[in-house]
Amino acid sequence: MQHEAFEKNSLLLLIGILIVVSIGGLVQIAPLFWVDSTIEKVRGMRPYTPLEQAGRDIYVREGCYGCHSQMIRTLRDEVERYGHYSLAAESMYDHPFQWGSKRTGPDLARVGGKYSDLWHAEHLSNPRALVPESVMPGYPWLAETKLDGRDMMAKLMTLKRVGVPYSEDMLKNAEQDLIAQISPDTRKAAELVRRYPKAKVAKFDNKPGQEPSELDALIAYLQMLGTLVDFATFDAAGPNLR
């Protein structure tokens, strides 16, 4: 094969590389748009509640993703430690997704329900009070900072534009649902659970008050992770699954 021209002309070599990489990318990526099980259809998945979404925003803002992944790989040691391997469907409403394998702390894909709200509140305030060997910084200001939910409806509308299936009812009640999720045994809380099945309703930071704190939001988000899919009924079989 005559390749002298490529060796002597860096621009031509660059163009050749781009062409080859483009063809390889198309061959591998394009078929995924026609494969039904690229993202599994999994029962139970729903958009985040307004409080969970606010907590996720705080999770990203504080850089939690730098030390914690949310992707359990199919390796035996990870499945035995953390639980069922992560499904693509579990991240389908994440913008941006929280995948990764670099961990300073444990993976959080299945942390929901593993610890109590009080444990999370104390751990986020002073990690070494519960885990002496922890290198995680504390976030005591979250409990004292009132959650600003004035733009929550606009946030959900933006997410809807990129494919998150928020209904008009969800959008209309966005700010109301922030309060409802920290108000157990109320009519509004019942309406919230109707809109968002399996949503946990509690005063997550264990402090009195009628308005959510940033700590409420972050704990609500953590307590939801990994709880939506019922793996007792999940069938990982399909014509396109490998």
Language model: regions and residue ranges:
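Post-cleavage N-terminal segment of exported redox proteins
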Residues: 1-48, 184-190, 194-195, 221-242
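The canonical Cys-X-X-Cys-His
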Residues: 55, 61-70, 120, 218, ...
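Short pre-active-site segment immediately N-terminal to redox-active cysteine/selenocysteine motifs
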Residues: 62-66, 71, 104-107, 135
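Surface-exposed patches in mature extracellular/periplasmic domains of secreted proteins
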Residues: 67, 133-139, 229-237
